[in-house]
Amino acid sequence: VDEQLPRTIMNIFEK
């Protein structure tokens, strides 16, 4: 499952 990579990136961008 490669759905945690983009999720982490989006989280950092949201900060």
Swiss-Prot record:
Superkingdom assignment: Eukaryota
Name this protein carries in UniProt: Unknown protein 26
Organism of origin: Pseudotsuga menziesii (Douglas-fir)
